[in-house]
Amino acid sequence: GIAESLHPLVQSRFRMPRQIDYYFSLQSPWAYIGHTPFVRLVSTYDLKVNYRPVLLVDLFSETGGLPLAKRHPVRQRYRLIELQRWRDKRGLNFHLQPANWPFNARLADGVVIAVLEAGLDPEPFLQRAYPAVWELELNLADPATLVKLADDAGLPGRQLVERSGSDAISAAYEQNRQNALDAGVFGSPGYVLDGEVFWGQDRIELLDDALKSGRKPYSSVGEGQESD
């Protein structure tokens, strides 16, 4: 049809928004570094984002990864170099080793789930919470800090933080972990478009290419280009 012959950016105006699953944790520096370009991409292609906060320590343990403290010193040192490179590349100004990091992200990630559960937009909170960790060195394991961040985002902070500690939110958090494993996601950020995983904020440009071209998703057995 006519819509199918148009550029993908124009096509998006003729149909329901494409969906993308966004697996992340507020604990992750890479999710923070990639968040602004990801949001820009979402706007450009009119994507519907399915936000999936996930507990990284569990995801790592089940997929062969290691938390930072258990990695070889060579890998730890290289990570600091990469953070500096991407800090410059993305035009950011953040601490490589912020005072209150690492932290238990269950409550902070749970606030995002609670926001979604309430039918609200998590973006205003995320756009405050990410820099709160990496630029302002705030403690996102502290309930009062989370309440203020949510309030500043125009959200009911106290109610959301209370809800974040509930069994229902914990169950949703666990379900996100299982969904991540089922999707083939093993770190943060993980972007899943039509079943194709893009791991890491340094894959955003490749995600852009996939959206721009309108190509079929690639698979691990090389069938991405085959016709139906």
Predicted regions: what is each one?
Residues R18-D21, L26-L47, E117-L120, P124, ...:
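C-terminal cap of thioredoxin/glutaredoxin-like
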Residues P8-V10, V111, V115, R177-A180:
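Short, charged low-complexity linear motifs
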Residues R15-P17, L59-E62, Q76-Y78, R90, ...:
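Generic detector of short, locally flexible boundary/turn motifs and exposed helical patches
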Residues L26, Y32-V133, Y218-Q225:
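Structural alpha/beta surface segment adjacent to cysteine/selenocysteine redox centers
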Residues G1-R15:
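Short, Lys/Arg-enriched N-terminal segments with co-localized hydrophobic residues
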